[in-house]
């Protein structure tokens, strides 16, 4: 049995859950478009189709960051987790292979940061927690911006600082983390190879 096939059979339940969620989302899109067509609301249908197209483009940008583990993590996160909604935006083309740090280290740092936020979420929330992760390339650095709307323990700041410190100069906080009663914001930078 090929390695890829073995992986699929070993993780069948998880893969089926992801595929079912993806199929469900696409069927919802088709139902909305069908309803607009039946009601003769063509402009609303066009606007909705534009929204679906932008979502597909966003997913394509995530898939092209040249870090398959992180792309898969981002693209499957919401299908596998219910406690926090994660939205990822890639503002400019990002190529993780151009970083000074290894791709696996970048994956570990970003995914662990999200895991820390997830772990430190307060159990009682006013609204469902929503995290926007924005990646972009500028001036020979890649930036990762985390913007959480939701209540999270203040302990997360210290753990994120330790996580960055453990990567010995391969990552740094751009500014102080901002923690309020309703959210948390941090921006990290990662130097590219010269």
Please place each PLM-identified region on the residue numbering.
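Conserved catalytic submotifs in the C-terminal HATPase_c
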Residues: 89-96
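Short beta-to-alpha transition helix within the HATPase_c
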Residues: 66-84
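Conserved beta-strand-loop-beta-strand hairpin that lines the nucleotide-binding pocket
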Residues: 93, 122-156, 186
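Conserved signal-transmission helix
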Residues: 1-15
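Conserved ATP-binding N-box helix of the HATPase_c
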Residues: 18, 23-39, 102-134, 162-163
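C-terminal edge-of-domain segments
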Residues: 176-194
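ATP phosphate-binding glycine-rich loop and adjacent ATP-lid/helix-beta elements
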Residues: 154-181
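DHp/HisKA dimerization-phosphotransfer hairpin of two-component histidine kinases
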Residues: 27-63
